[in-house]
Amino acid sequence: MTCTALVLGAGGFIGSHMVRRLKSEGYWVRGVDLKRPEFSSTEADEFIQGDLTDPLFVERILKYTGSTGNFYKQDVPRKYWNPFNEIYQFAADMGGAGFIFTGENDAEIMHNSATINLNILNEQKKLNDLLDHNYTKIFYSSSACMYPAYQQETTEDPKLPEDIAYPAAPDSEYGWEKLFSERLYLTYNR
């Protein structure tokens, strides 16, 4: 049976490259993002544009209903629902350094990104419970912004092991949200 993967944030730089990598390894891939990839066409078997802050949208994209791409068929019987083998979570509300470090957009960025991650975890848990399933592997992509700023001041030692993230002192609200979401995914995995 073909392995299936869901790539969230598949329109971005890292997500689009992950889609390419998974396809080269033989996966069936569904890509999801607010926008299509800017610099090349997607290699995803199915690419869906939509807003991950919408829990109903997230509920639908988490169901793999066949390699023919049945996302747009509204009434796929439950017997055809399957969870993805793997989920790669790169999606975030992030407009670049000039956007996130101004202070004007911090609350909205934190809210939207936290909502995306809460929706993914809540809806995956519901699907797992409904299908009596718990083997979907989820990869969450964090950011170096979650480390304390003083740990990032030198280029002499670029290593940032996880144990130096605490005591927490991220350099921005974006970093705080990434740290919060890391904790969400760790807790979900218990």
Describe every region a protein language model picked out.
Residues 5-25:
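N-terminal Rossmann NAD(P)H-binding glycine-rich loop of SDR-like oxidoreductase domains
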Residues 27-36:
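Conserved glycine-rich Rossmann-like NAD(P)H-binding loop of the short-chain dehydrogenase/reductase
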Residues 43-54:
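Rossmann-fold cofactor-recognition segment
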Residues 52-113:
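NAD(P)H-binding glycine-rich loop region in Rossmannoid oxidoreductase-like domains
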Residues 54, 116-120, 137, 180-181:
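Conserved cofactor-binding/catalytic machinery of classical short-chain dehydrogenase/reductase
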Residues 89, 118-173:
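Conserved Rossmann-fold NAD(P)-dependent oxidoreductase catalytic core, especially the SDR/UDP-sugar
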Residues 108-119, 172, 176-177:
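Glycine-rich NAD(P)-binding loop of the Rossmann-fold in SDR/ketoreductase-type enzymes
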Residues 169-190:
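Active-site Tyr-X1-5-Lys
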